[in-house]
């Protein structure tokens, strides 16, 4: 399990909330707080490569890593004795929640703005590279270096 785990133990019903691609648990924090007020145990893991100062960390990870983070979060709750577990996710987090719904004994699940299969182009790559450039410029990277990294990744 990654080191960044927001876990508030309350009642016997547990919910795992997964954040979006390039996001953090802050993406789902409002929902988590509301559930906590209703006596739900809430676990909001930070997916590998996310919430890092260096945006290159996210490029070291992929869907298999994030699904593994989801499975580890689920197993954390099971190991702590929870049997009534629900999973919800935003965007990428919804993909992880869906994986858990299909492969684990979850009570309920939900997705918010999750990716679907599309035959047309999406804006996800464009938005990602805008985010990446913004983060790298904050670290002092030059535009040429950012473009070089983008080309290297896109041509893998």
Where are these regions (language model features)?
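The conserved beta1-alpha1 loop
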Residues: 16-22
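Gly/Ala-rich beta-loop-alpha elbow adjacent to hydrolase catalytic centers
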Residues: 88-93, 97
């Amino acid at each position: 399990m990654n080191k960044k785990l927001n876990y508030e133990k309350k009642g016997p019903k547990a919910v795992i909330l997964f954040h979006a691609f390039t996001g953090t648990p802050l993406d789902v924090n409002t929902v988590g707080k509301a559930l906590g007020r209703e006596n739900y145990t809430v676990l909001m893991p930070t997916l590998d490569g996310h919430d890092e100062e260096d945006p290159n960390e996210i490029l070291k990870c992929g869907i298999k890593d994030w699904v593994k983070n989801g499975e580890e979060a689920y197993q954390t709750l099971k190991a702590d004795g929870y049997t009534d577990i629900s999973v919800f996710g935003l965007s990428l987090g919804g993909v992880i929640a869906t994986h858990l719904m299909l492969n684990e004994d979850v009570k309920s699940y939900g997705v918010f703005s999750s990716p679907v299969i599309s035959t047309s182009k999406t804006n996800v790559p464009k938005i990602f590279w805008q985010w990446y450039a913004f983060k790298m410029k904050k670290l002092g990277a030059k535009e040429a270096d950012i473009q070089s990294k983008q080309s290297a990744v896109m041509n893998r």
